[in-house]
């Protein structure tokens, strides 16, 4: 029982393939590189996939029993897979946030996958651990993060700060929330977990709510504090203070605040310094989520957006968004790594070793949720070395400049308006109500609620019409009840001419949409 009979082994046919044959790897690898290079030459036309649900049903229902050639497989990729791909690297991709690729990022990923190490602790692959610590310090220095967030070679520094590469912001937030939870429960008793409260704005990424659920926070104790146009949808410190005081009055325990630099809907920026001042009065762990906009803060002119970060407990950004590093690569820095380790560490006998026992190495398995971990630092290292700080800043500034160009094009068309300030490289705009209703808004008896509903509806139709054309791809958000179209510049291949072309496409579809509008709603 529990073993395979030897007669079965003897009767098995011997496979003639070696899954890791160096010569075949070289041959097939060249084919893949050529395939992808050709893909990038031709990705300049379409952006969003026009496939319908179930489009992959043409593929076989079962796996092949015998091997197939790489030539056949690549042909199927061309015919069956690519038509169902939304082309995130297209220069005409302006949706969500960018997933900016680069040659260095791709090649770094290739090296990482090629070595295929599992660097859960230092002993399992020393170079993977030590390179990660180095690149996290490099990037932290580029951001001008305080030394309390960086690794120190000075044994007398007394700092337990440092950085770790997570998969996504969701993981980074979950890790820091778990660390703060355990730190607090060790003080007040684990039986009081239902008293813990998590704070954010109504613009904070949904990753925080998911993390709170996983960490066992009572859903009733999740505070999404309302924002408004008056603060450009940033979180008000006074609103935070009032909410905290009300919770304390109710016998609850403030635990965790997630402040955002560059919200998903509108790239709003929470005031880090003032929020930290409020939070620190109550011992609240402050995490700064700069998933999108953090990359821009390597440029001195954007660094002020994270002023006050020295008072926060943790900080993260996604290098796979706007830093030319392939998915997944979330950079997390913490001041107190001991809190992470205490909350997340495990020490089974089969992982014990002298290096870990010496306390002179980092075991990154204790800084994350999973045990296994990828060699993510390799691709970030290649990006930093291949382009250098000066070029990376130049790339980012070019995207901001293109967004300002788009902003200027909108300003010249009186039918449109900018809904929220253009802070980084995303423009949020909409068709004005006046453009939709032909100047009838000043008439008596106008139902302004109906006007806003109709305006939102028309802007939604405009977006869907543009996206259905396949020429460009944008997405939307709703802030303060206003439906707006998001134009996010950041694809590596995008040039100013693509932005100008996108605007022409938008204008053409606007002309068509406005020609069919029924403005009887104002009557």
UniProtKB/Swiss-Prot annotation:
Biased composition (Polar residues): 1-19
Tissue: Roots.
Stretches the record annotates as Disordered: 1-20, 47-66
Any single GO CC term annotated in Swiss-Prot or TrEMBL for this entry: cytoplasm
Gene3D superfamilies: Aspartate Aminotransferase, domain 1, dopa decarboxylase, N-terminal domain, Type I PLP-dependent aspartate aminotransferase-like (Major domain)
One Pfam family named in its UniProt record: Pyridoxal_deC
Listed GO MF terms: 5-hydroxy-L-tryptophan decarboxylase activity; L-dopa decarboxylase activity; pyridoxal phosphate binding; tyrosine decarboxylase activity
Catalytic reaction annotation: L-tyrosine + H(+) = tyramine + CO2; L-dopa + H(+) = dopamine + CO2; 5-hydroxy-L-tryptophan + H(+) = serotonin + CO2
Keyword hit for Lyase: yes
Needed cofactors: pyridoxal 5'-phosphate
GO process annotations (BP): amino acid metabolic process; carboxylic acid metabolic process
Stored CDD domains: DOPA_deC_like
UniProt-listed PANTHER family: GROUP II PYRIDOXAL-5-PHOSPHATE DECARBOXYLASE, TYROSINE DECARBOXYLASE
Protein name as catalogued: Tyrosine/DOPA decarboxylase 5
């Amino acid at each position: 029982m529990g073993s395979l009979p030897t007669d079965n082994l003897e009767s098995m046919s011997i496979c003639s393939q070696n899954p890791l044959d160096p010569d075949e790897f070289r041959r097939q690898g060249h084919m893949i590189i050529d395939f992808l290079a050709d893909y990038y030459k031709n990705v300049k036309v379409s952006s969003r996939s026009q496939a319908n649900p179930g489009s992959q049903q043409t593929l076989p229902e079962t796996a092949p029993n015998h091997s197939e050639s790489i030539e056949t497989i690549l042909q199927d990729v061309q015919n069956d897979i690519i038509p169902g791909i939304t082309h995130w690297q297209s220069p005409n991709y302006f949706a969500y946030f960018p997933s900016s690729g680069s040659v260095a990022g791709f090649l770094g990923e290739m090296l990482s996958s090629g070595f295929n190490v599992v660097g859960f602790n230092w002993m399992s692959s020393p170079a993977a651990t030590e390179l990660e610590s180095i690149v996290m310090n490099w990037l932290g220095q580029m951001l001008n993060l305080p030394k309390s967030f960086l690794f120190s070679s000075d044994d007398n520094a007394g700092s337990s700060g440092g950085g770790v590469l997570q998969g996504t912001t969701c993981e980074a937030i979950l890790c820091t929330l778990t660390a703060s939870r355990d730190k607090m429960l060790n003080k007040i008793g684990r039986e009081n977990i239902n008293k813990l409260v998590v704070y954010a704005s109504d613009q904070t990424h949904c990753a925080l709510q998911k993390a709170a659920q996983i960490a066992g926070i009572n859903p009733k104790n999740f505070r999404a504090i309302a924002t408004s146009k008056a603060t450009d949808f940033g979180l008000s410190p006074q609103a935070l203070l009032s909410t905290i005081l009300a919770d304390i009055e109710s016998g609850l325990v403030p635990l965790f605040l997630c402040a955002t630099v560059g919200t998903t809907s509108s790239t709003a920026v929470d005031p880090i310094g003032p929020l930290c001042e409020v939070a620190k009065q109550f011992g609240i762990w402050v995490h700064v989520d700069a998933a999108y906009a953090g990359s821009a803060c390597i440029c001195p002119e954007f660094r002020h957006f994270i002023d006050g970060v020295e008072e926060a407990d943790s900080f993260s950004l996604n290098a796979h968004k706007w830093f030319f590093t392939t998915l997944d690569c979330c950079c997390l820095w913490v001041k107190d790594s001991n809190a992470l380790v205490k909350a997340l560490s495990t020490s089974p006998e089969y992982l014990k070793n002298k290096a870990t026992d010496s306390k002179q190495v980092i075991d990154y398995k204790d800084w994350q949720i999973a045990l296994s971990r990828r060699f993510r630092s390799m691709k970030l290292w290649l990006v930093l070395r291949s382009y250098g700080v000066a070029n990376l800043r130049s790339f980012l500034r070019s995207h901001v400049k293109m967004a300002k160009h788009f902003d200027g094009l909108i300003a010249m068309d009186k039918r449109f308006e900018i809904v929220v300030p253009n802070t980084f490289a995303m423009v949020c705009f909409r068709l004005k109500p006046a453009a939709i209703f032909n100047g009838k808004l000043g008439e008596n008896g106008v139902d302004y609620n109906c006007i806003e509903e109709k305006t939102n509806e028309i802007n939604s139709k405009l977006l869907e019409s543009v996206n259905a054309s396949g020429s460009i791809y944008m997405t939307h958000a709703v802030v303060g009840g206003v439906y707006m179209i998001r134009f996010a510049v950041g694809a590596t291949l995008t040039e100013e001419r693509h932005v100008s072309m996108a605007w022409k496409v938008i204008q053409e579809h606007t002309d068509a949409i406005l020609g069919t509008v029924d403005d009887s709603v104002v009557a």
